[in-house]
From Swiss-Prot:
Lineage: Bacteria, Bacillati, Bacillota, Bacilli, Bacillales
GO BP term (any one): mismatch repair
UniProt xrefs under SMART domains: MUTSac, MUTSd
Family annotation (SUPFAM superfamilies): DNA repair protein MutS, domain I, DNA repair protein MutS, domain II, DNA repair protein MutS, domain III, P-loop containing nucleoside triphosphate hydrolases
Similarity remark: Belongs to the DNA mismatch repair MutS family.
Disulfide pairings: none
Record's protein name: DNA mismatch repair protein MutS
Gene source species: Bacillus cereus (strain ATCC 14579 / DSM 31 / CCUG 7414 / JCM 2152 / NBRC 15305 / NCIMB 9373 / NCTC 2599 / NRRL B-3711)
An example molecular function term from Gene Ontology annotations: ATP binding
Length: 884
């Protein structure tokens, strides 16, 4: 048996092998040691025929599902090896085969599968010209997609990340460096498949795919699925081709910064835009909503179609509420179809399918009555599958058991033979009850009873006290107990045979009838999948209508002009979280000839919220939802770029400033005049003058070369003078007022630049020490009153022994003030200088390497460089200094 195990294990080295032995799945050797640790189960051992014992652990077969889910949830694979012949009739070792390989990307059900999220398996194929093809499959729904990608490896990885896949399939020669990024950066399970030809029998799924590259990626994906699942895949849907330029592009960093589907802090749905908009009533509607949010539209006509449909639902309360009530009764048709194809559907699943289908005719009829071309096109070709509803209605019991092997699944009247067996079983038991009464009357023994157990079958039981009353020769002794004797008669044995045969045949026949019924349902899978898409889309549209009415959103107007007009706009999620507290709305009005808003104002005043607000309004508009405003006119944006908040962890090993520059580069390189750019305090990760210079250069480049609608917030108040030289830039600020020495943030956007930053007031709100606040105010007053370097005030620090107060020599002050510095390093203001800063230094301020770098900096002509060239030069010089 161990030899058999090792032979099977050789083909599944990267998976736990669940090896069926009787009522247990056993694991041996390294699998056992690792599984015992991961599953927290007992590790034992068995004799292996040598001096060392074989490590071993096992789980009961009826509880295996839970243990398999635990392992897969941790990123492992599990190969399930079953006994494929009856041990009673087997000659020698029972024949065993792996019947399924369960992986993170091929899980069909379990707690790891969120009902409102897809579980995609990805396959990535790299070509010699540098391009990639990415194919994805959700085995639970049968959905298949494929796209062609170009760009850097990081761009490809981010697109893979956007699919939400937990497992990715590549060929065995795939770059090890890229694999490391997949495992370390994206935490994905890696699998291998070299076959790329479309498997026999699945050619019809790629009829609309003509590009050889795309077919190779799909072929790799399908071959892996077939190899791991080893069963029917009748529910796989035709492959959908998508191109990234068909949708608004939002890179993963921006999606995370905007918290579209999950929050930055908790990585959970609650608190995201998806959380707010999700009023769907079906699981499949929830999945479609998330897909829409991942890929907003850029076709004006399609967006307007959705908006008109949402408006119809908003204006017709009774239609919307009636639709919602019916949708509540619709189960997950996509995943039910998948279970039918996989052969793991049970009677309760089919009952759910029937209950869902009962709602469909009324839903389709209500939508057909609407005077709306989009609605008519949506339901065109949708089949309510009434014949399937009728079939399930007359075949499946109303309260069937979970197991399909326990009987009591099929209704009376569905099958004549089954009805006959049930009649024999039912009447046989009635006959036994009558026999018991008759025997009591004949013998006069009132305590006589007829019973049944699995070992002895039916019997007549008489207590020992009443044995003398039994007629001679009437009964045949069968079993002796302490206080009773059990007997049988020829008549009872005959009936027992009929009853037991009938009950055994009932269970087997019901199982056979159910499996045949399942095959009949398979025929309807394509119709069920089409129906699922129709119902999902209606569900998302009613969800938009429901949230729009509840939150008082308005239908926007899409314009072909490059103008933004938002009156009383709100951040939808912040407003919801405030839960009735006063939210301050803000306008965002950018005419066609106005491209850049330079936003100033104190921290905590709402600059970032205002910027995110515009982005979320834009996303909502382009998925077809009403928006949080009293009036809105928007163009269709092709891309959104954001740099808001702290550094992302997707690109590891880079400083905050470097990540900031890389994201700025991404926007500058890819944005068009139809894009939206949101930059929050660009340049803050380096020194003041470097940051200010870069911020100004970036603003000028966007203004002069790109022309994208841009919100650029900054604490560099010196930049506000750009309004005088850049005719399509406008200063705006978030207002605040001082009352009794305290700052009050009004959260209102107003024209013009901010007059103060109120940073010290924010520090007061954070409850920094009073002495520190007082010192900060003193330094601020000095800074605002002069341009020369401030000599830090000496603060006496008490330790074990009071240190003498440092003496500042007048000649030293004069020397410092007379020194005219041009470099960034020497012009930085020192607020907290130590004793050494008041003394003459014995060694030069700059070493030889630093002097050389300084000389290079002096020669740089920033006005003759592009922002990207400036960033590259800065990065090069910084690396040169760090090497020392």
């Amino acid at each position: 048996m161990i030899q058999q195990y090792l032979k099977v294990k050789a083909d599944y080295q990267d998976a736990f092998l669940f090896f069926r032995l009787g009522d247990f799945y056993e694991m041996f050797f390294e699998d056992a040691v690792k599984a015992a640790h991961e599953l927290e189960i007992t590790l034992t051992s068995r004799d292996g025929g040598s001096s060392e014992r074989i490590p071993m652990c096992g789980v009961p077969y009826h509880a295996a599902k839970n243990y398999i889910e635990q392992l897969v949830e941790k990123g492992y694979k599990v190969a399930v090896c079953e006994q494929v012949e009856d041990p009673k009739t087997a000659k020698g070792v029972v024949r065993r085969e792996v019947v399924q390989l369960i992986t993170p990307g091929t899980m069909m059900e379990g707690r790891t599968i969120d009902e409102k999220e897809n579980n995609f398996l990805a396959a990535l194929t790299h070509f010699e010209d540098g391009s990639y093809a990415l194919a994805c499959n959700d085995l639970t729904t049968g959905q298949n997609t494929v796209t062609l990608l170009t760009g850097s490896v990081e761009d490809i990885l981010l697109e893979v990340y956007a699919t939400g896949s937990k497992e990715i399939v590549v060929d065995s020669s795939f770059s090890k460096d890229e694999l490391n990024k997949l495992t370390e950066t994206l935490k994905m399970t890696i699998s291998y498949e070299d076959a790329t030809a479309i498997p026999e029998g699945l050619e019809h799924l790629v009829k609309n795919v003509s590009q050889a590259k795309l077919i190779k990626a799909v072929g790799r994906l399908f071959n892996y699925v077939i190899r791991t699942q080893k069963r029917s895949l009748d529910h796989l849907q035709p492959v959908e081709i998508y191109y990234t330029n068909q949708f608004m592009k939002i890179d993963v960093h921006s999606k995370r910064n905007l918290e579209l589907t999950e929050t930055l802090r908790t990585k959970e749905k609650t608190g995201s835009l998806l959380w707010l908009l999700d009023k769907t009533k079906t699981a499949m509607g929830g999945r479609m909503l998330k897909q829409w949010m991942e890929r907003p539209l850029i076709q004006k006509e399609r967006i307007e179609e959705r908006l008109e449909m949402v408006e119809t639902f908003v204006n017709d309360y009774f239609l919307r509420e009636d639709l919602k009530e019916k949708l509540k009764e619709v189960y997950d048709l996509e995943r039910l179809a998948g279970k039918v194809a996989f052969g793991n559907v049970n009677a309760r699943d089919l009952l759910q399918l029937r209950r869902s289908l009962l709602q469909v005719p009324a839903i389709l009829e209500a939508i057909s009555l609407l005077d709306n071309a989009y609605a008519s096109r949506l339901i065109q070709g949708a089949d309510p599958c009434e014949s399937l509803t009728e079939l399930l209605g007359r075949s499946i019991q109303e309260n069937p058991p979970l197991s399909i092997k326990d009987g009591d699944i099929i209704k009376d009247g569905y099958n004549d033979k089954l009805d006959q067996y049930r009649y024999v079983s039912k009447n046989g038991k009635t006959w036994i009850a009558e026999l018991e009464k008759r025997e009591r009357d004949i013998t006069g023994i009132k305590s006589l009873k007829i019973g049944y157990n699995r070992i002895f079958g039916y019997y007549i039981e008489v207590t020992k006290a009443n044995l003398a009353a039994l007629p001679e020769g009437r009964y045949e002794r069968k079993q002796t107990l302490a206080n009773a004797e059990r007997f049988i008669t020829d008549e009872l044995k005959e009936k027992e045979t009929l009853i037991l045969e009938a009950e055994e045949k009932i269970v087997q026949l019901e199982y056979d009838l159910f499996t045949a019924l399942r095959e009949e349902v398979k025929v309807f899978i394509p119709k069920l999948q089409h129906l699922a898409k129709v119902i999902s889309e209606l569900d998302v549209l009613q969800s938009f209508a429901t949230v729009s009415e509840e939150e008082q959103f308005v239908k926007l107007v899409l314009t072909t002009k490059r103008e933004i007009f938002i009156k009383d706009g709100r951040h939808p999620v912040v407003e919801k979280v405030l839960n009735g507290k006063l939210y301050v709305p803000n306008d965002c009005i950018m005419p066609e000839k106005m491209d850049v808003f330079l936003i100033t104002g104190p921290n905590m005043s709402g600059k970032s919220t205002y910027m995110r607000q515009l982005a979320l309004v834009t996303v909502m508009s382009q998925i077809g939802c009403f928006v949080p405003a009293t009036e809105a006119v928007l163009p269709v944006f092709d891309q959104i770029f954001t740099r808001i908040g702290a550094a992302d962890d997707l690109i590891s090993g880079q400083s905050t400033f470097m990540v900031e520059m890389l994201e700025a580069k991404n926007a500058i390189a890819n944005a068009s005049e139809r894009s939206l750019i949101l930059f929050d305090e660009i340049g803050r990760g380096t020194s003041t003058y470097d940051g200010m210079a870069l911020a100004q250069a970036i603003i000028e480049h966007i203004h002069d070369q790109i022309g994208a609608k841009t919100l650029f917030s900054t604490h560099y108040h010196e930049l506000t003078v750009l309004e005088e030289s850049l005719d399509q830039l406008k200063n705006v600020h978030v207002s605040a007022i001082e009352e009794n020495g305290k700052v009050v943030f009004l959260h209102k956007i107003q024209d013009g630049a901010a007059d103060k930053s109120y940073g010290i007031h924010v520090a007061q709100l954070a409850e920094l020490p009073d002495s520190l606040i007082a010192r900060a105010k003193e330094v601020l007053a000095q800074l605002e009153g002069q341009e020369e370097i401030i000599i830090p005030k000496r603060v006496e620090v008490k330790v074990q022994e009071a240190a003498p107060e440092p003496v500042v020599v007048k000649e030293e002050i004069a020397e410092i003030q007379e020194t005219k510095v041009e470099t960034e390093e020497e012009s930085q203001l020192s607020f907290f200088g130590g004793e050494q800063s008041s003394k003459k230094q014995d060694k030069p301020l700059l070493d030889q390497k630093e002097t050389a770098v300084l000389a290079q900096i002096k020669k740089i002509d920033l006005l003759d460089m592009t922002p990207l060239e400036a960033m590259n030069e800065l990065y090069r010089l910084q690396k040169k200094l760090k090497k020392g």
